[in-house]
Swiss-Prot record:
Principal place of residence: cytoplasm
Residue positions, PTM Phosphotyrosine: 44, 287
This protein's encoding gene: Eno1
Modified residue annotations for N-acetylserine: 2
Family from the record: Belongs to the enolase family.
Protein name as annotated: Alpha-enolase
């Protein structure tokens, strides 16, 4: 079934910034997709086209990206009469029309919006759920429900506190189902709220962009201590482990790292990559930390390689790899990390996201599907993580509707699968291992 009409518009993301939404019509109905947007973005990401017209939305409008869809992409796809199940063909067509390495002509936000809508239409065309259509596109015969990684304490560029490291996450790996993982996550979250309130006062429980708390602490160890306490109070010490997203590129300063980067600059306090690595190792020793994302700057390749070889935990590349096949291939050959963070808007199409995932998995890596800090009510990544069988997803705390929208969709999928539902649990790093 071919595309009858495509219409794009500017809508608002969870931070009040404009983003792209696409309505795609086939004979089967309307299929709608919205594009997310990040705060701490890797410099190697595909280009998110913003208007840069300072008189409108502080320069963050996306009317050009919308216009590229309505005036160029839409007429081309409608006239070509391609069947919506042909995801790769349609994505390729848009990428060729754009003609740039990083999608800077149309904007990755334009191409991705259409790509996501096409994928949703393709599922209905085939008469299968979206996660099953994605599994088919990826060549996966089975599907797996992921362990959620809840970002419950925020720092870095996501928060107004002094904390340098961006995310402290809880992963309920000991749960027996996704529904149970949600319950554990929610209960630990509420216990954490009380722990923070008792220690720092009620105003310390205000939430950040992703629904986590942002108490005004400076020491990263203090965040881990708060998590350890909340997990114990909730009664889940044996079932919950901790993950971190350091986003170290945000505080990289000419070969060193500044763990107090939100204070006035003082080079005397910078630490070396080796000192930072030792700090991480102390975290792993003293807390149930099993996963660290972006521990070093996106170009500090040597530090990544050294750490991954010796840490014995999951080391996740986000700014390092930006869901880009070339960066993933380099990181794989240099053994820089052992897990890919998959963000559809870093690469800008469904097909390339699937390819990035496959490439990472073929190198023996784990893959964690991720939201962005500027999100919408779109739930595509919930179906994506199930269809790709990656076993892990991070899409915020169990708080704020744009985060819960994804988690709730995974709950529905688990219910629909019934007795066939398989939860990744403790095998979240490699759920397909027999």
């Amino acid at each position: 079934m071919s595309i009858l009409r495509i219409h794009a518009r500017e809508i608002f993301d969870s931070r009040g910034n404009p983003t792209v939404e696409v309505d795609l019509y086939t004979a089967k109905g309307l299929f709608r997709a919205a594009v997310p947007s990040g705060a701490s973005t890797g410099i190697y990401e595909a280009l998110e086209l913003r208007d840069n017209d300072k008189t409108r939305f502080m320069g963050k409008g996306v009317s050009q990206a919308v216009e590229h869809i309505n005036k160029t992409i839409a007429p081309a796809l409608v006239s070509k009469k391609v069947n919506v199940v042909e995801q790769e063909k349609i994505d390729k067509l848009m990428i060729e029309m754009d003609g740039t390495e990083n999608k800077s002509k149309f904007g990755a936000n334009a191409i991705l919006g259409v790509s996501l809508a096409v994928c949703k239409a393709g599922a209905v065309e085939k008469g299968v759920p979206l996660y099953r259509h994605i599994a088919d596109l990826a060549g996966n015969p089975e599907v797996i429900l992921p362990v959620p990684a809840f970002n419950v304490i925020n720092g870095g560029s996501h928060a107004g506190n002094k904390l340098a490291m961006q995310e402290f996450m809880i992963l309920p790996v000991g749960a027996s189902s996704f529904r149970e993982a949600m319950r554990i996550g929610a209960e630990v979250y509420h216990n954490l709220k009380n722990v923070i309130k008792e220690k720092y006062g009620k105003d310390a429980t205000n939430v950040g962009d992703e629904g986590g708390f942002a108490p005004n602490i400076l020491e990263n160890k203090e965040a881990l201590e708060l998590l350890k306490t909340a997990i114990a109070k909730a009664g889940y010490t044996d079932q919950v482990v901790i993950g971190m997203d350091v986003a170290a590129s945000e505080f990289y300063r000419s070969g060193k790292y500044d763990l107090d980067f939100k204070s006035p600059d003082d080079p005397s306090r910078y630490i070396t990559p080796d000192q930072l690595a030792d700090l991480y190792k102390s975290f792993v020793q003293n807390y149930p930390v099993v996963s660290i994302e972006d521990p070093f700057d996106q170009d500090d390749w040597g530090a990544w390689q050294k750490f991954t070889a010796s840490a014995g935990i999951q080391v996740v590349g986000d700014d390092l790899t930006v869901t880009n096949p070339k960066r993933i291939a380099k990181a794989a050959s240099e053994k820089s990390c052992n897990c890919l963070l998959l963000k559809v808007n870093q690469i800008g199409s469904v097909t390339e996201s699937l390819q990035a995932c496959k490439l990472a998995q073929s190198n023996g890596w784990g893959v964690m599907v991720s939201h962005r800090s500027g999100e919408t009510e779109d739930t595509f990544i919930a179906d994506l993580v199930v269809g790709l069988c990656t076993g892990q997803i991070k899409t915020g705390a169990p708080c704020r509707s744009e985060r819960l929208a994804k988690y709730n969709q995974i709950l529905r999928i688990e219910e629909e699968l019934g007795s066939k539902a398989k939860f990744a649990g403790r095998s979240f790093r490699n759920p397909l291992a027999k």
